Amino acid sequence: RCLRREGYVFSTESLISFYTSHGWTLKTAEVYRLSDNICTLLVCAVAEECDRFMKNGRGSTLRMRSAIESLRRLPELEINEVFSALCPTETLFMKVKGFADGDDATRDVYREALIRCARRRREDECVLLSRMTEQCGDGRLLALIAPHSHLPAVMYYLLTTVLAVAVSAFSFLMWGWLSLFAVLPVFEAVYSLGDFVFSRIVKTTPPLRLSPEKLPCERETLVVITTLLFGGDKDDGIFERLEEFWLRNEHKGLRFGILGDFCDCREPKLDGDDVIAKNAAEHIKRLNAEYGDNFALFLRRRTKNSSGIYGGRERKRGAVVDLIKALRGGEKPETFICPFDMSKISYLLTLDSDTELPIDGAIELLSAAMHPENMPVLKDGRVVSGYGIFQPAVRTRLADSTRTYHALFGSRSSGVYERASYDRYQTLLGSGVFCGKGLIDIEL
């Protein structure tokens, strides 16, 4: 009626005004269906006018033009304004910090979880949400509305195990003891089949994020590239990459640095070590002079390992541990340049020398790590809720995935995109496996 009254001229303001003038409200699911309903009505209006033209030539050109123009403007519907004006649950949601400070995708996760929970319990959305917000207080609302279920994980491992055992038993009956050579390939094939099936059955929920403008700047983040330094042109490329990362992720709460080691050798120090350290320090000083005091250098001394070789202690793992200790007032590396206050660093983002950090990639990780639902909760020294480490999805570039046969096997050819969206452990169990590249909460 609103569209007919306005001559099929559509706008968010006229729609809200029509509903509020009649004292009508909408449920969450009805708001999501609103765009499709309006689209259907406008298409029917165009069809009616075309039918009138065909029958007696008395169709309204103005109404048809208005309906077509409204169809073109339909994507401009401000869904958040509609929610705020017409949906009673939005007022309750805005009292929850994780929802109020979240981005649009995060708000959709909350709303869709409420829709499913209300349908499952057969309760009114407002009554259910009001009770849930009182129960959670300042805690995790989403954990109450949509608690993580371990049923998909149980079904996955049960079905894959039964299928693998059945195939192995059949192979043993057919080929006897020779089938033992096929046990590992069979299990790998079954797990791959299980990943393929469950990636289409189990819905992957996007991580909850804060809006970028809601990120607290008092908790700073240090982005470091862990690498070996050799001097010369090889090191120049690493510092150029560090500069690119800064330009792609310029933010007042981000700091950048190099976490380096010297190459392995049989002596604690080589003649060229001082030149390598001096070259690295000059690069850091140049970046600080050009972009402000936002760059640091952490270059460790060699230590002797059990094999009698001198090198960085425990390589990358040891480098990260030593850096966290230094950030918290511990022993500093041999070559140390840090013009900013290290005590303000709350997060450490570790990257490899061959890792790409996309535009605003660090900010996206931070927005997920700082969301109230994702903040880690400790019990007896272990994280029992939330996350202490955030690891971004690893995407293999198509050019790299087909460069060698080994890379083709590792990227699984056509699975380049699926592997970035579905993860067996994270999707089914709610936790992942850290591979060394990610955001670490160093305050734990």
Q: Which ranges hold each PLM region?
A:
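Internal catalytic domains of large membrane-associated glycosyltransferases
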Residues: R1-M155, P207-L444
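Alpha-helical bilayer-embedded segments of polytopic membrane proteins, i.e.
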Residues: S149-D195, P392-A393
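Conserved catalytic alpha/beta cores of large enzymes that bind or transform nucleotide phosphates
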Residues: Y191-V197, F230, G260
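Transmembrane-cytosolic junction motif
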Residues: L193-R209
